[in-house]
C-alpha cells in the first residue's frame, strides 16, 4: 500500500510539473476571432538563403499585437532591416537545408493555405533575451508535404505565426 501511495505522489508531482510549464495565452478567443474575420488564411512560399517560409500579410503582427500589448508583449523583431521577412510561418531553417542537401524548393512562389487553430505562449530556450513568445498554431498539411518531399523529418514544433515577444526584464543591481 505504501508503494502505491508513493507512486501516486510521484505521478502527481510529475504531472503537476508538466502542467506548470504551460503558460496561458491571454486574449486567444479574440485573436482567433479577429484572424477568422479579418486576415487572409494563405501566404506565398519563399526562400531567403535557405530560410524557407510562408510570407504573410504583416497585419498578422501589426493588428494582433494590440490584443496582447497590455500583457507586456511587443512586436517580434521581424521588421526594419532589408533581410528581415516580417510576418511568416517558418517551413525550413538554413541549417536543415544544408543538413538534408536541399538546394531548391520548386514550390516557391506558390500560395499556401493554413487554418489558425489555437494560441500558445512559450519560454524560448534559445532566445536568451526573450522571456515569452506568443504565437498562433496553424494547421498547414501542404507544409508537411513539402518537408516530406525534400527528405526533411516532421517538425519538432507546430507550424505557427509569432505575433509577440516579451523581453526579459533586466534585474536591478
Locate the predicted segments by residue.
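Hydrophobic h-region of N-terminal signal peptides that target proteins for export
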Residues: 11-19
